Structures are given as C-alpha cells and as structure tokens.
Amino acid sequence: MVAIVGFLMIIVIVFLLLRGLMSPIVVLAMIPSIAALILGYDPVTIGGFIKKGVETTMGNGILFIFSVIYFGILSDTGFFDVIVNFLVKKAGNNVIAITVATAVVATIAHLDGTTAATVLITVPSFYPVYKKMNISPKILLCLTGGCMGVMNLLPWGGPTARAATVLEMDATTLWHMLIPLQIIGLIINFVLAVLLGMLAVKQGAGMGKGVEDEVDEKATAEAEALRKPAPYLVFNLILTVALIGILASGIVSSYIVFMIGLCIILAVNYPNQKLQDKLIKKNAPAALIISATLFAAGAMVGIFEGTGMLTAMAQALMSIIPAPLGRYIHVIFGILALPLGLCVGTDAYFYGIMPLVMKVGETYGVASLSTALTMIIGKN
C-alpha cells in the first residue's frame, strides 16, 4: 500500500510539473502532504515530517536568496555589459576570437546560475556579430548551452542546489566534489569554441563586412542611471572573485558569504537607502521563487522519509530489477539523465526520480552521493 501510494504520488507530481498545471511550490508541498494523509498520518505528524525536511534545506534556500540578488545587482552596475563590449571589440574580425569570446561571456554571465540572464546577456550581444561575420547562429547556441551546463554546477545553480536538498547536505560541500570536473568542463568548452571557430572559417565565415566598433544595446534611461564607472566595476570584480574564492575554500558557510557580499556591493555602489530598497525589490522575486521551491522540496523529502514511502518503493523496484543490473543503476540513469530531464522537467527529475534511484542504488551498495553526482553530471 505504501509503495503504491508513493508511485502514484510521483506520477502525479511529474504530470503536474510536466504540464505546468500548478506552481512547483504547490506541487512539491501539497501532493506529498495529501499522500501522507491517505496513508493515515495525522496533520500534526505530517507537520513534523515537513519541519524536519525544511530544516535540511534552510542553508541552501538562504544561499539562493542572497546570491541571486547579489548577481542581479552586479548586472545592474553594468558589469557584464562592459565585459561583453570589451571582448567583442578585441575579437574584431577574427572568427575564432569571436567564438572564444562567446564562451567567455556565457561562462561569466552564468555566474548567477539563471538561464534567462545568461541568454539575455550573451545572445543579443553576439547574434548581430555572428550575422555580420556569416557565422552560423547554431554555434552561438551550442557554446552558450555548453557553458551554462558547466556553470550550473555552482552551489547556487539549480541542479546542485536541488541535489543537495535531496541529499540533505550543504550545496557548497557538494560543489567542492564537482570543482575538478567543472574545471575540465570549462577547458573542454574553450577547446570546443576554438574548434567551432575553425569549422566556421572553413564554412566561409569571416567573409562579411566585419563588426562595427560599437556593439551597444539600447538600454533604458533607468538602466543607464544604474551603471557605474570603471573604478566601481574593478571593485565589483575583485569582490566577486574574493567571494567565489572564499566559497571554494569552505571556511565560511556559503549563505553568510553572499549575505555579507550583498551588503558590501550595495553599500559601495548604491549608498542611497531608497535606491538600495528599490534594487532589492527589483531582484528579490526571482530569488524568493527559487528559495520557496527549495523549501517546498524539503517538505517533500521530509514526508518521503518520515512515511517510509521511499523505502517501500525501493523494495518494490528491487523485486523486478536484476541484481547484476542494480549495481550499475547510477550509471544507467547518468546516461539517461539528459533525455529524461528533457522529458519530465528539472524539478520532477531531481525531486521525483532522483530520490527513488538513490534509494534503489543504496540497496545494491551504491552510495547515494555517487548516484546524485552521476545524475547531476549526466543532466548537465
């Protein structure tokens, strides 16, 4: 009975998230609660499960709030625009330099971990250049996507934070295990940028009129008013590098790093209290939605474990999975991660499928951490 309710709950969660019928926050908190009620647990007990689960996500949720607002304000200062314009000008009419610059910008732009910001910074800036230089826009999308996949492994990136929530561990601790792979991924992306640039030259790129000296977006008056001069941008660069360095060292909790970092960047760049409030309100919605989703996922994980649904489902799957295959279940799902993620969506993949695969893997001697790392890497 417990396993059946668990499987039905997973199916409903995946269906609702895949069809976009409800907000992930509602789905992840409400559906498991209903499943627990069906299993006979009273509201007080369910509340205890939820409390325990949410407590494990607290650090990661707070990290998201401060990191997303920090990078949003960093973007408001014109930090990313300056980097884009500088690299485009330096690349000139050199096709390979343009593709490498694309990879650099996409990598830096995805420091905030949000897809929308990366695409809005990278694609509009480089698409006119690609068009004039007769470079296939597929290369632009390929490089942007590749760099986003690698940078998604940052602790405030969606996949790492979601997996850390399921593992009930700090996202920064999980990221430390992924740093070597992330470095290799960045190197591969830049090598790929060079190779795609060479391929574009063979296909006739660079035969256009060339890029113009000025590649500037038509920014609104409000955005222009927020832009800061060079000395501030240098300070912002040093601050950001310092924050990431402290995170990599692991000497301070990640959310504390960004909490202090946010205070510093606001105090230095925008010392006016009203303007500070305005910028926080501007960037807060995205941060709060992500954090609320993490807390809701924590509620789901708490109910999963408290009711024993996860264990019951794993035992049911063990009865139909051949033992020799079970030892490699993490590898199998690592290979299937990309198409599976595309089919069911990110939240359903990490909060619906990953916990079950981890539990099944445990019964065959595969550590949950190994399964999670494999599924994160495969997904990105």
Where are these regions (language model features)?
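Structural signal for alpha-helical transmembrane segments and their membrane-water exit/capping regions
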Residues: 1-4, 12-45, 67-78, 232, ...
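Structural signature of hydrophobic alpha-helical transmembrane segments
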Residues: 1-6, 58-66, 114-119, 180-183, ...
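Long, contiguous bundles of hydrophobic transmembrane helices that form the permeation core
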Residues: 4-7, 39, 176-279
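Interfacial loop-to-helix junctions that mark the boundaries of transmembrane helices
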Residues: 1-2, 19, 49-59, 171-180, ...
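Membrane-embedded alpha-helical segments and adjacent helix-loop junctions characteristic
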Residues: 43-131, 274-362
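Membrane-embedded alpha-helical segments of multi-pass transporters/permeases
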Residues: 14, 36-40, 111, 190-194, ...
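Membrane-core helix-loop-helix motifs of multi-pass transport proteins
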Residues: 128-215, 221-227, 366-380
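Hydrophobic alpha-helical transmembrane segments
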Residues: 3-8, 26-29, 61, 96-101, ...
